[in-house]
Amino acid sequence: VIDKLDKSDIYDVIFVVSRFSSLDDIVPIIRNNKSQNIVFVGNNIAVEKYMKLENKNVLFAFFMAAGKKYDGYIKSICLNKIVIGRVDGKNIDDEFIKSIFEKTKIKVTIENKMNDYLKSHACAVLPLVFASYKVNGNLKLLKKDKEYSLLIMDAIIEEYNVLKKLGYEILPKGEYENCINKKNLCAFIYRFMFSNFIGELCISDHAM
């Protein structure tokens, strides 16, 4: 882990782990560095802005973890899974990606339509963010609200439909069909999350 990157610091791959709002400050540093392989990790809904850095092989990734930093410690949950890949549908980096994680315990899913994946993820998250706003971060107030959880599902499906009309694929595969065909089950899962620490760590701590 580094917090400084000079022009002559050469790495096989650089993982950029940062808030989306901080990326514009980091990109000039990345451009100035001579390392070729760059992986932007996180909720990035503006992939188009960062996917064509000159002389760089740019990948995007989403790591299955969430948490919040407190004074002196971090409260977190981590599934040790990562979705990573290109944005153009080509599999030319698959072997390189596998080599990065070869001696780790991280479960890797290679997805070479990461722009579609990250936009799909944003669609799923946004209604949950507004749910947090509705109750000022106390999601337990919604744990028995079946009607509202179904409205969340309606919102997610509506967003997915917009994405599809814009030409994007809803990813991971089967996600759209699950929302349509298992709507009540998905709504129940959200109510379960609202009732415990999962909702706090994965939703409200990020939203508020």
Task: Name each model feature, range by range.
Residues 1-2, 125:
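N-terminal glycine-rich dinucleotide-binding loop that anchors FAD/FMN and/or NAD(P) in oxidoreductases
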Residues 45-121, 126-127:
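Rossmann-fold dinucleotide-binding core
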Residues 115-143, 147-160:
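Active-site-proximal catalytic alpha-helix in oxidoreductases
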Residues 104, 130-134, 200:
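A short secondary-structure junction motif
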Residues 147-198:
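Small-residue-rich helix-loop
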Residues 2-74:
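Rossmann-like NAD(P)(H) cofactor-binding subdomain of soluble oxidoreductases
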